[in-house]
Amino acid sequence: KREIEEFDWEDVKNFIYTPTYLTRRRAEGSTNWESVNVPFGFDIMPSALPLSLVELQMAMAGSKTASGKIYLYYIYDLVKCIKENADYDYIIIDTPPALGALTTCAMMAAEAIIVPSNLDIMSFRGIQSFKESADYIQETAKAQGIEHRGILGILLSLYSERRSVDKALEEYVHEFYPTPTFQTQIRESSDAKRANANGMLFAQINKKAKADFDKLVDEIEFALKDPKAWEKKTQELWEKIKAEREGEVNE
């Protein structure tokens, strides 16, 4: 039986922040405009540069801390503490693009995993090794009585409808990876960097990006609520792509 890390909510909540963005709006009861900070509709627990040292310390210490706590469940216990004390619809854990100790901990803490991937062969090759790790995490979680969906789906990003190679690579993913792929793709845009530089969301300054993310959220909710229907839907998509491709070849 694994040891459990007990977190103090009073300590944890001090690291949770509600981010804001600067906008202009008409002052109440006045014709004058003023600059105000408006809160986003979510909270964050931001990372920091010293976090990069944590993974190094974890690797040097092995699978356990000095106190004997198993690292694999550390973020799981942290998330459990947040769930018990705060009312969030969803908790999203963003991880670095590397299968290190922190990413493994985050995978254990997640009820389901979304795999973002650029549209290039090297990124696709990494999906298979990642899937093997995700399958191991899922089996380990179930052995501890923890509900875990494994990989929910692959999300293609930096997508451009103007590049025929992107369409070909999308078809490649559907054909050669048994893992479901979201129909939504996050399109490539310079606005993403502009939003990041100005402390804004990509969707705030790009209407097409907002439509992409709205559609993605709908897909994720559907996949979480009805797994069998989700898998059937993604399979039907591949069958449609395959039929269209065969039709083009015959012509």
Task: Kindly give the residue locations of the regions a language model identified.
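P-loop NTP-binding core
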Residues: 1-251
